[in-house]
Amino acid sequence: MTEAVPSSALSEVSLRLLCHDDIDTVKHLCGDWFPIEYPDSWYRDITSNKKFFSLAATYRGDIVGMIVAEIKNRTKIHKEDGDILASSFSVDTQVAYILSLGVVKEFRKHGIGSLLLESLKDHISTTAQDHCKAIYLHVLTTNNTAISFYENRDFKQHHYLPYYYSIRGVLKDGFTYVLYINGGHPPWTILDYIQHLGSALANLSPCSIPHRIYRQAQSLLCSFLPWSSISTKGGIEYSRTM
């Protein structure tokens, strides 16, 4: 596509699911976008298997972007990403894995990538509702454009994966990026526990603890010495404004 893309292109973009007839086009696009060679079975799966959410963005009939994702139980997360969610979440908790997200070069920076990502979120809210707690993906450590895209949309780097990719026989490093949704969160670290404890202590009045201890001691003493009259006026006083 050589013609200039108008700034209003997004208003002419339509969304539809990929189908078997799109295989050749999708192969060509993925060859342009990604350095990884996918087997033919992968293209058949993402265009035919209902377990994949495979959405195309089209402009005047041509595919100019697509997203492929799979919503699955947390038990099916690969070992290297097994700690994406805290162990407190049940085994039937779901996650969404983005296998692919790409936009034709001429149509980048027109909001199409964001539209596709938001469409995935809408799909999750409709099908998985609040059972899906995270959206995650893998990216080459050298793919700064993709990294900036996801970081600008609140994805956080979760893991560094050395030698994760094999590209034309050369091993390349990758990152796992995660966006937590619907209350999802990773396992707590020691720092998280310290911060939580600090937050809890910060909500306590610094003088409320000794004041409570004094009151409890006074009550206990009165129960043993009923003849004793202990006046708070002559005792210890604590300011409530400390």
UniProtKB/Swiss-Prot annotation:
<keyword id="KW-0007">Acetylation</keyword>
<dbReference type="Pfam" id="PF00583">
    <property type="entry name" value="Acetyltransf_1"/>
</dbReference>
<feature type="modified residue" description="N6-acetyllysine; by autocatalysis">
    <location>
        <position position="121"/>
    </location>
</feature>
<dbReference type="GO" id="GO:0004402">
    <property type="term" value="F:histone acetyltransferase activity"/>
</dbReference>
<feature type="binding site">
    <location>
        <begin position="109"/>
        <end position="114"/>
    </location>
    <ligand>
        <name>acetyl-CoA</name>
    </ligand>
</feature>
<feature type="modified residue" description="N6-acetyllysine; by autocatalysis">
    <location>
        <position position="105"/>
    </location>
</feature>
<comment type="similarity">
    <text>Belongs to the acetyltransferase family. NAA60 subfamily.</text>
</comment>
<keyword id="KW-0159">Chromosome partition</keyword>
<protein>
    <recommendedName>
        <fullName>N-alpha-acetyltransferase 60</fullName>
        <ecNumber>2.3.1.259</ecNumber>
        <ecNumber>2.3.1.48</ecNumber>
    </recommendedName>
</protein>
<feature type="active site">
    <location>
        <position position="97"/>
    </location>
</feature>
<feature type="modified residue" description="N6-acetyllysine; by autocatalysis">
    <location>
        <position position="109"/>
    </location>
</feature>
<feature type="binding site">
    <location>
        <begin position="150"/>
        <end position="153"/>
    </location>
    <ligand>
        <name>acetyl-CoA</name>
    </ligand>
</feature>
<feature type="binding site">
    <location>
        <position position="143"/>
    </location>
    <ligand>
        <name>acetyl-CoA</name>
    </ligand>
</feature>
<feature type="topological domain" description="Cytoplasmic">
    <location>
        <begin position="1"/>
        <end position="192"/>
    </location>
</feature>
<feature type="binding site">
    <location>
        <begin position="101"/>
        <end position="103"/>
    </location>
    <ligand>
        <name>acetyl-CoA</name>
    </ligand>
</feature>
<feature type="binding site">
    <location>
        <position position="99"/>
    </location>
    <ligand>
        <name>substrate</name>
    </ligand>
</feature>
<dbReference type="InterPro" id="IPR000182">
    <property type="entry name" value="GNAT_dom"/>
</dbReference>
<dbReference type="GO" id="GO:0120518">
    <property type="term" value="F:protein N-terminal-methionine acetyltransferase activity"/>
</dbReference>
<feature type="binding site">
    <location>
        <position position="165"/>
    </location>
    <ligand>
        <name>substrate</name>
    </ligand>
</feature>
<feature type="modified residue" description="N6-acetyllysine; by autocatalysis">
    <location>
        <position position="79"/>
    </location>
</feature>
<dbReference type="GO" id="GO:0006334">
    <property type="term" value="P:nucleosome assembly"/>
</dbReference>
<feature type="modified residue" description="N6-acetyllysine; by autocatalysis">
    <location>
        <position position="156"/>
    </location>
</feature>
<feature type="region of interest" description="Required for homodimerization">
    <location>
        <begin position="162"/>
        <end position="173"/>
    </location>
</feature>
<dbReference type="GO" id="GO:0017196">
    <property type="term" value="P:N-terminal peptidyl-methionine acetylation"/>
</dbReference>
<keyword id="KW-0808">Transferase</keyword>
<keyword id="KW-0156">Chromatin regulator</keyword>
<feature type="topological domain" description="Cytoplasmic">
    <location>
        <begin position="237"/>
        <end position="242"/>
    </location>
</feature>
<comment type="subunit">
    <text>Monomer and homodimer; monomer in presence of substrate and homodimer in its absence.</text>
</comment>
<keyword id="KW-0472">Membrane</keyword>
<dbReference type="GO" id="GO:0000139">
    <property type="term" value="C:Golgi membrane"/>
</dbReference>
<dbReference type="GO" id="GO:0010485">
    <property type="term" value="F:histone H4 acetyltransferase activity"/>
</dbReference>
<dbReference type="GO" id="GO:0008283">
    <property type="term" value="P:cell population proliferation"/>
</dbReference>
<dbReference type="InterPro" id="IPR016181">
    <property type="entry name" value="Acyl_CoA_acyltransferase"/>
</dbReference>
<dbReference type="InterPro" id="IPR045141">
    <property type="entry name" value="NAA60-like"/>
</dbReference>
<dbReference type="GO" id="GO:0007059">
    <property type="term" value="P:chromosome segregation"/>
</dbReference>
<feature type="domain" description="N-acetyltransferase">
    <location>
        <begin position="13"/>
        <end position="182"/>
    </location>
</feature>
<keyword id="KW-0333">Golgi apparatus</keyword>
<dbReference type="GO" id="GO:0006474">
    <property type="term" value="P:N-terminal protein amino acid acetylation"/>
</dbReference>
<feature type="active site">
    <location>
        <position position="138"/>
    </location>
</feature>
<feature type="binding site">
    <location>
        <position position="38"/>
    </location>
    <ligand>
        <name>substrate</name>
    </ligand>
</feature>
<dbReference type="GO" id="GO:0042803">
    <property type="term" value="F:protein homodimerization activity"/>
</dbReference>
<feature type="intramembrane region" description="Helical">
    <location>
        <begin position="193"/>
        <end position="236"/>
    </location>
</feature>
